[in-house]
Amino acid sequence: MENFHQQEHLECIQVIENNIMEARATSRYNRQSARKIRKVLDNVRQYRVGDAINYLHFSPEKASVVIEKTIRSAVANLMQIEGNNEFDPNTFGIKEAFVNQGPVMKRFRAASMGRAARLRRPSSHLTIVVTTE
């Protein structure tokens, strides 16, 4: 079977309506189930970017590292679109944050009495959209 490695695909969306811009960052093939990432993501969705990064940095969850990295990537994309290198975390907000299920690697483990037990190694895709609103 294939080995899935975490990839980060960066897409930039530029929307100019009343000087509101947004950017997107996607982290794919995260080696954690979508359900476990969604548990942390539900807490972060309501925050501004600065508060979300602060919450995630001190969170003990494994998923918080991936989410924080993706948020920082989306903010960097937005600053690149704007052409502004000054980062004020309270000026950016999280517009969308969702996680989808990725491919599942299936492995077999030896079980008692000559049987084999199937192990599922889930992965997930995380998408974050940041806006200047």
Report the location of each language-model feature:
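A short, conserved strand-capping beta-turn/loop at the end of a beta strand
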Residues: 98-111
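Ribosome large-subunit tunnel/peptidyl-transferase-proximal elements
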Residues: 2-4, 9-99, 125-133
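Short, solvent-exposed beta-edge and connector elements
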Residues: 32, 112-113
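Short, low-complexity, polar/charged sequence segments that are solvent-exposed and flexible
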Residues: 75, 113-117
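C-terminal binding/interaction regions
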Residues: 105-106, 116, 121-133
